[in-house]
Amino acid sequence: MSIAWSCFVLGLFALASLQVALANDCAQKTFKTGIVCVCNITYCDEIPDINLLSGQAATFTTSKSGARLHRDVVYATNSDPLTSMHFTIDSSKTYQTIQGFGSTFSDASGANLKSLPDQMADTILRQYFSDSGLNLQFGRVPIASNDFSSRVYTYDDNLEDYNMAHFSLQREDYQWKIPYMQMAQKYNHDLKFFAVPWSAPGWLKTTNSTKGYGILLGTNQDTYHKSYVTYILHFLEEYQKNGILFWGLSTQNEPTSGSDKKTKMQSMGFTAEFQRDFIKLDIGPALKSSNAGKNVKILILDDNRGNLPKWADTVLNDKDAASYVSGIAVHSYQDDESDKHLTQTHNNHPDVFIFGTEASEGSKSKDVDYGSFDRAEDYVSDILDDFNNWVTGWTERNLVLDAQGGPSWVSGFADAPVIAFPALAQFYKQPMFYAIAHFSHFLKPGAVRIDHSLNMPNPEIERSAFLNPDGSKVVVLHNKNPLAPYSLSIKDTMKSTDHYQVHLSPKTIVTLYIQN
């Protein structure tokens, strides 16, 4: 082959490689607060392949300036680069196993998926649940309606139907939940679903309404409690008939809200003592003796971390109640509370996992903020804070919302990683989508957090490190500083001759992936 022909072939190969790289890029649209990536029926950006040989490493960068998981190969050096900041990872010292990331199959998510062409809905689910996308491992499923529904409904509104003879799934289940749960399973055959009620039917509550505050009528093992347990079991059974098995069940979403008279959404109040006894005497034994519930893990709390460790202590210090409990569910809305709440809870109950079951942005301002990098950074900070304090999983509040941040019957609008525009046959991927990807795409099921240290205090750089089952290592770094860049020398104690230099521009999220 002539030199000229060889150069021509190499040139074509380089051009093709460049075109492939560009084909994966974000189709940017700029708003006042930042950049979104626009997807339509023919195009949507993809996460670059890791594509590394043994011993190689790469960084994946997302920035306020517009990078979205931009891939750069990083070469190890035998000598320590000339930088003052040194970050060390040590995989010989491990902490909790990471169970994975998830999102919620809310009515609002299903309604928005349904509003788009089928091919686009499929694209969204592939980008969320396939291993080439966010690689989500969990799906949260509301039992009946919640604040992200278009209407208030339960599965049995027939007064005094204590045996739940008239229990019936609703159109929302058949149109907006089950079909998309099944589609997601196509991309992740090991997808785990966990269910949670916002309220019992109103006629089983002290206020005779699913909306607002109120508690479950009756006492343990009486007609009211048995009826409500039957209601939950029927839900699990009906979904099982549709091919959906549940990995977990939280006994109540935000139980402290149900005791607040200001609460407007569907809610039901539990104290820690009430939840302890409800698990021990009602739902726990019933699940164990049922076909649909015998393998379901019970999660307690499902509320903000400020309730810990006291709530967990109250439930789990009762040996009988604890025998039914697998996990402690936490929300992200009080993460200004000390992270010591999480670590103390783990120390008190090391055999019970802690799992993040709800996180969202925009719930206070009730809006969608197109291109907000601040909200992406909030997600990264929340995940790092959680994982550095023994949390094993993290769940987004909605898969997809509309331009207003809904639908929501109670106007409880919020932001989401994906925003649908059915009239344009488009959807936007918010920076929050990529923030989640910095963890979920790279951490494989069974990954463990490993020890890490920075040689000098720097609150502007948030970080954590992980070891995958295949031996690959993942370091996630977040430079919060809006002006100052940093350079880090990253050293793996298990390969003491290898040093990786990573540059952190201002307002940047970086994942370093080191192939085994």
Swiss-Prot record:
Concerning Gene3D superfamilies, the annotation shows: Glycosidases
A GO CC annotation recorded here is: membrane
The record's catalysed reaction(s) read: a beta-D-glucosylceramide + H2O = an N-acyl-sphingoid base + D-glucose; a beta-D-glucosyl-(1<->1')-N-acylsphing-4-enine + H2O = an N-acylsphing-4-enine + D-glucose; an N-acyl-1-beta-D-glucosyl-15-methylhexadecasphing-4-enine + H2O = an N-acyl-15-methylhexadecasphing-4-enine + D-glucose
Q: Which residues form the active site?
A: 254, 358
Listed A to Z, the keywords are:
Hydrolase, Lipid metabolism, Signal, Sphingolipid metabolism
Q: State the InterPro entries in the record.
A: GH30_C (IPR033452), Glyco_hydro_30 (IPR001139), Glyco_hydro_30_TIM-barrel (IPR033453), Glycoside_hydrolase_SF (IPR017853)
Q: Which species does this protein come from?
A: Caenorhabditis elegans
Write down what this protein is called: Putative glucosylceramidase 2
Does this UniProt record's set of keywords contain Lipid metabolism?
Answer: yes
Give the enzyme class: hydrolase
Q: Which family does it belong to?
A: Belongs to the glycosyl hydrolase 30 family.
Q: Please describe what this protein does.
A: Glucosylceramidase that catalyzes the hydrolysis of glucosylceramides into free ceramides and glucose. C.elegans contain specific sphingoid bases, which are unique or different in structure compared to the sphingoid bases found in other animals. Two examples of these distinctive compounds are: 15-methylhexadecasphinganine and 15-methylhexadecasphing-4-enine.
